[in-house]
């Protein structure tokens, strides 16, 4: 173990206080010649680290799993999951939680190495990760953070000096992922499937203490836990939909109890507005299509409610009723959050009867004319309506008049309305073709400058600066249809 207080390590291991069935203690598998290729300076500082120290050989060895910091307690977490509707016992097959960093402000964050070698949950996998998918997770998770969407984050990426074999031979890498925790709906499914009410209660109590301490004294804290998670997920999915983010693999093991977005495998951002948009190569039925995401979140949360039934009430029928009642509230909460967000995207402060219809009409036209989702709202925000099939259409011109007269009805000025739009309509998203361009340069040519430039632009998505304009251009028809892969 390395001991260096100048670096800023301040690890605790509260997860290891849970019953041992929830994890397996296992060290990372060392790699031959690690090199640091990306460090997140601002995140490092917020976690209490000295970024300059993290660039030193001793700390790079930690990011690679070749050494452990003082206080580390590496473990692979066990969990289950419905993967495309099919239930499996799973677990961290290529990741290890090395500990929980306590920040200078007293907050607790999991520090996880992703690609750190095989574990008892690897299911015949090699436990490793390729450089491309790890850089991709870094780019997208940091873009999500800048968009103000709850997310896990990326502290560092190191190359391992060893190949990883997928369809082809690829350079290996390890990502250091930071999360409020890695407790998932699947963690509760795992506890329930094992059949021990004591273990299930231990997990629920731990989760409440860690994420929702304000409900500890609630008369039925387990019902309150379900309510809190539903609230968090309703807000999260609304935020995804509002920026056109498609997760791609909303299995129950990828739904966090903290309400953070996790697992950036086959995710992507929508170009042309289409409710049926799917990018993931393995989602052949469109289960996790853009328009299905709210329904799939409700489905996943119903699996959480099922898992909690043994502790919701001593009477099983009453417990089932509580679970059903709570799950039925998700769609109302989601729709409310989405509607509030959409009104902000259109500069609407007050409530008017026509608002729902105004929004619906816009989306019908966007779908009809295959309008770019992000750029449509960007153009409305800037009030610069370029020559596009949507903006040139007679029905849009009619809609635009209605919208303008709706803005004029408000007490707030139009300037204030456009300012609110600017704060809610990103000018830039991680366009799929731009992300691929950055990954190609880094992985194939060892040129990280394309990625650095992209990350710099993505860090301020609401800036509307001229430097970002090149990143606002939608992909050429030759870059479509875009397909994503999970990288495992």
UniProtKB/Swiss-Prot annotation:
Residues that, per the record, bind Mg(2+): 254, 263
Single GO molecular function: AMPylase activity
Binding site for ATP: 91, 93-94, 114, 126-127, 177, 184, 263
Catalytic activity: L-seryl-[protein] + ATP = 3-O-(5'-adenylyl)-L-seryl-[protein] + diphosphate; L-threonyl-[protein] + ATP = 3-O-(5'-adenylyl)-L-threonyl-[protein] + diphosphate; L-tyrosyl-[protein] + ATP = O-(5'-adenylyl)-L-tyrosyl-[protein] + diphosphate; L-histidyl-[protein] + UTP = N(tele)-(5'-uridylyl)-L-histidyl-[protein] + diphosphate
Keywords for the protein's UniProt record, in alphabetical order: ATP-binding, Magnesium, Manganese, Metal-binding, Nucleotide-binding, Nucleotidyltransferase, Transferase
E.C. no: 2.7.7.-, 2.7.7.108
Signal peptide: none
Family, as annotated: Belongs to the SELO family.
Function: Nucleotidyltransferase involved in the post-translational modification of proteins. It can catalyze the addition of adenosine monophosphate (AMP) or uridine monophosphate (UMP) to a protein, resulting in modifications known as AMPylation and UMPylation.
PANTHER family xref list: PROTEIN ADENYLYLTRANSFERASE SELO, MITOCHONDRIAL
Name recorded for this polypeptide: Protein nucleotidyltransferase YdiU
């Amino acid at each position: 173990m390395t001991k260096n207080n100048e670096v800023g390590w301040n690890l605790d291991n509260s997860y290891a206080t849970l019953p041992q069935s929830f994890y397996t203690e296992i060290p990372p598998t060392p790699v031959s010649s690690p090199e640091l290729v990306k460090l997140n300076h601002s995140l490092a500082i917020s976690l209490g680290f000295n970024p300059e120290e993290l660039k030193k050989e001793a700390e790079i060895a930690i990011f690679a799993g070749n050494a452990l910091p003082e206080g580390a307690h590496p473990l692979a977490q066990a969990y289950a999951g419905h993967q495309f509707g099919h239930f499996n016992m799973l677990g961290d097959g290529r990741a290890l939680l090395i500990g929980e960093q306590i920040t200078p402000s007293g907050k607790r964050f999991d520090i996880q190495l992703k690609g750190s070698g095989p574990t008892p949950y690897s299911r015949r996998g090699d436990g490793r990760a390729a450089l491309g998918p790890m850089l991709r997770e870094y780019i997208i998770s940091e873009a999500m953070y800048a968009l103000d969407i709850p997310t896990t984050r990326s502290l560092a990426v190191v190359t391992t000096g060893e190949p990883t074999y997928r369809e082809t031979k690829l350079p290996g890498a390890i990502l250091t992922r930071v999360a409020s925790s890695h407790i998932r709906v699947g963690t509760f499914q795992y506890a329930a499937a094992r059949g021990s009410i004591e273990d299930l209660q231990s997990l629920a109590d731990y989760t409440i203490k860690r994420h929702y301490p304000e409900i500890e004294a609630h008369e039925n804290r387990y019902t309150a836990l379900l309510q809190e998670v539903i609230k968090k997920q309703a807000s999260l999915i609304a935020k995804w939909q509002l920026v056109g983010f498609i997760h791609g693999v909303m299995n129950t093991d990828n739904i966090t109890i903290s309400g953070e977005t996790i697992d950036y495998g086959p995710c992507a951002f929508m170009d042309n507005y289409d409710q049926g948009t799917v990018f993931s190569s393995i989602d052949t039925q469109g289960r996790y299509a853009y328009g299905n995401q709210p329904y799939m979140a409700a489905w996943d949360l119903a699996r959480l409610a099922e898992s909690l039934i043994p502790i919701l009430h001593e009477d099983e029928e009453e417990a089932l009723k509580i679970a059903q009642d709570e799950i039925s509230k998700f769609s109302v909460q989601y729709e409310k959050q989405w509607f509030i967000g959409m009104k902000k995207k259109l500069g609407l402060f007050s409530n008017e009867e026509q608002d729902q219809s105004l929004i619906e009409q816009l989306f019908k036209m966007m779908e009809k004319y295959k309008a770019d989702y992000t750029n449509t709202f960007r153009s409305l925000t800037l009030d610069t309506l370029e020559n596009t099939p949507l903006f040139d259409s007679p029905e849009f011109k009619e809609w635009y008049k209605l919208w303008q007269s709706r803005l004029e009805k408000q007490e707030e000025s139009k300037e204030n309305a456009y300012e609110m739009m600017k704060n809610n309509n990103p000018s830039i998203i991680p366009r799929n073709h731009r992300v691929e361009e950055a990954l190609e340069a880094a992985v194939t040519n060892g040129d990280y400058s394309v990625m650095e430039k992209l990350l710099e632009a993505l860090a301020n998505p609401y800036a509307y600066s001229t430097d970002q304009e090149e990143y606002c251009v939608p992909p050429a028809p030759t870059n479509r249809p875009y397909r994503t892969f999970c990288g495992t």
